[in-house]
């Protein structure tokens, strides 16, 4: 995730505000495994420094993609990340907000203008989404004919809630319930989590909360997975809805706590090696050092692959990511460099049946985690 901390920490209010907005906007793309281009990062820095305006930044990004002759699938995804980041940056620095159905659909329209043809349009079809944290299962989202009424009901219930009658813990619990319920409606074909995040940030600001920290920027995938767990149950398998993970996120955001936010702790019916870690996680905070000193992405890759041999596409599907360059950069390359991962055909990197598997070192690390 791109780091604009140098601007956020320094004293100039305008640079700090724009630095936070860009960092959050870019970080939110991770909910769909997207990563912006280097050109977007360069353009963002110019905007933060005051060399260009946000209008000029947007025009530069549009022109950059219009000038491209060929467009690969990766280009389409990077274009989405660049445009959505630019649009979210603009939204987060505006001093306006409408706590209405129109306000919510307007946020979606403005984030995905020029990206999705259906930007700002409520879906007229039902959807399912395979979730890594649910091991391929899906949350049950609101049926298309009921979406408008569901949103209006949730917003009206929230308007009537009296925050003066709850303490800090009750406040966090209520915010969690509201945001979780709004997300479960999933009113759009794509982009629901990013829209919910921006709507939530603007709503919290309208109530006087200072949410200019790195939670949404650095933990957007956790935010999504926590929303999934808060809205999923399978009684037959003994899995109930739980808001505990989302509460940890919002306690960090609103109360300044330092709870540990780990995606792997949320996996339902986890394999043995993950189950042991989930037990150890209880009452731990992020000030504690994890047992294994490997990056979170490498750890997820290791535990996902285990004793299998999988193609790059197969690995991405199991983890729930779709942007190949980002996946290679953040997962595959670090694991290869750490000596944890290897390829089945090292002399033929482009072999049509190329697979990834753990090395002896990777298997030892996997077994060490499994034995805990």
Predicted regions and their residues:
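FIC/Doc superfamily catalytic core
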Residues: 1-372
């Amino acid at each position: 995730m791109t780091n604009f901390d140098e601007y956020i920490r320094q004293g100039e209010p305008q640079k700090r505000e724009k630095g936070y907005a860009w960092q959050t906007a870019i970080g939110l793309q991770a909910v769909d495994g997207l990563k912006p281009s280097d050109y977007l990062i360069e353009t963002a820095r110019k905007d933060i420094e005051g060399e260009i305006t946000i209008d000029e930044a947007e025009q530069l990004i549009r022109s950059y993609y219009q000038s491209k002759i060929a467009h690969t699938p990766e280009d389409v995804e990077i274009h989405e990340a660049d445009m959505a980041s630019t649009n979210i940056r603009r939204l987060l620095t505006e001093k306006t907000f409408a706590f209405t159905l129109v306000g919510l659909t307007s946020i979606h329209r403005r984030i995905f203008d020029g990206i999705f043809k259906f930007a700002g349009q409520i879906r007229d079809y039902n959807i399912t989404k395979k979730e890594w944290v649910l091991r391929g299962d899906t949350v049950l989202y609101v049926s298309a004919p009921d979406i408008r009424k569901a949103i209006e009901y949730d917003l009206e219930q929230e308007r009537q809630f009296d925050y003066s009658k709850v303490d800090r813990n009750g406040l966090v619990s209520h915010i969690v319930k509201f945001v979780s319920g709004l997300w479960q409606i999933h009113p759009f074909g794509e982009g629901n989590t990013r829209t919910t995040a921006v709507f939530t940030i603007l709503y919290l600001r309208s109530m006087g909360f200072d949410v200019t920290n790195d939670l949404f920027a650095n933990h957007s995938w956790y935010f999504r997975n926590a929303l999934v767990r808060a809205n999923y149950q399978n009684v037959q398998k003994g899995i109930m809805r739980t808001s505990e993970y989302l509460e940890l996120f919002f306690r960090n955001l609103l109360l300044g706590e330092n709870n540990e936010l780990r995606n792997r702790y949320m996996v339902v019916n986890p394999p043995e090696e993950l189950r042991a870690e989930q037990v150890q996680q209880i009452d731990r905070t992020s000030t504690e050092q994890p047992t294994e000193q490997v990056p979170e992405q490498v750890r997820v890759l290791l535990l996902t692959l285990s004793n299998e041999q999988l193609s790059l596409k197969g690995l991405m599907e199991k983890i729930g990511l779709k942007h190949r360059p980002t996946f290679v950069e953040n997962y595959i390359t670090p694991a290869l460099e750490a000596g944890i991962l290897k390829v089945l055909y090292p002399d033929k990197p482009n072999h049509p049946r190329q697979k990834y598997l753990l090395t002896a070192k990777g298997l030892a690390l996997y077994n060490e985690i499994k034995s805990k």
